[in-house]
Structure formats: C-alpha cells, structure tokens
Amino acid sequence: MQPHHPKVLIVDDDPVHLEIYGLLMKQAGYEALLTLAKFSGAEIPKNEYIGLVLLDFRLNSVKTAPQYAQEIRSLYPSVPIIVLSDLWALPADIAPFVSGFVRKGEPAKLLETVSRFFAAPAAKSEKSPSFS
C-alpha cells in the first residue's frame, strides 16, 4: 500500500540542510525521509515507497553524489532524482543518473520542480525490491 502523502527521500551531509529541506517538503504536503550522508557513508533506505529524491551534490562522504545517484537508481529505477547544488549548472558526471537540477537557496523553484514531477502522469511512488 502506498502512503497518503508522496514521500521525498532527501540525502545530504549537513543535518541543518536536511532539517530545512524536510520542513519545506512537509509544509508543501509531502512526507520527508531524511538520510544523512556522513563521512562514513549513508544507508539508502530500502523497501520504502519513494516518489522523488533530493540529492545534494557536494557531499563530505566516502561516496560521491554520482555514486549515491547510481545506488538510488538501482533501488528505485523510475523515481526522479533532483540534484541540489550551489553550482550554476548540473555537473556532467551526475547528469546521466538524474532527472533535474535546482540551485540551493531557491525554495520556490525547488517546490515548483518537485510539484511538477509529482504532477506528471507517469509519477508514482516506487518501492524497492525486497532484500533478504
């Protein structure tokens, strides 16, 4: 059974950014699932109904954002991944794995982008396969 509110997975190495983006998503009516990408890495949740992923590009973690994007893509093949960054454009090394790019510090643009992906006809939450 899918959740009532679309679920957004947020991956960032900064706990403050996680809380800010989580609050922003909750205020917009989405359920936020926060994942801290620590230096030692982050455990991407499995067996969750994920509708969209927000992924920070500059991570102080053992894995890079493109590596996390590949992992997320393998778990949730059709779920959109939006990169968040203070860079001016989407970096080429992550482009093949993601669906969009939003500069940090633009909450209205972020909400517009998230809303657009959830409004798309093919948009649905996807649950990763069970791992035993």
PLM features per residue range, with description:
Residues 1-9, 15, 106-132:
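Non-catalytic signal-transmission and effector/linker regions of two-component phosphorelay proteins
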Residues 9, 33-52:
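Acidic, metal-coordinating helix/loop segments flanking the phosphotransfer/catalytic sites
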Residues 15-33:
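Two-component/phosphorelay signaling modules centered on CheY-like receiver
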Residues 46-48, 71-78:
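Conserved phosphotransfer cores of two-component systems
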Residues 53, 81, 101-102:
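Two-component signal transduction core modules
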Residues 54-71:
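Conserved phosphotransfer microenvironments
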Residues 84-85:
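Hydrophobic/aromatic residues positioned on beta-strands within the core alpha/beta folds
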Residues 93-102, 106:
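As written
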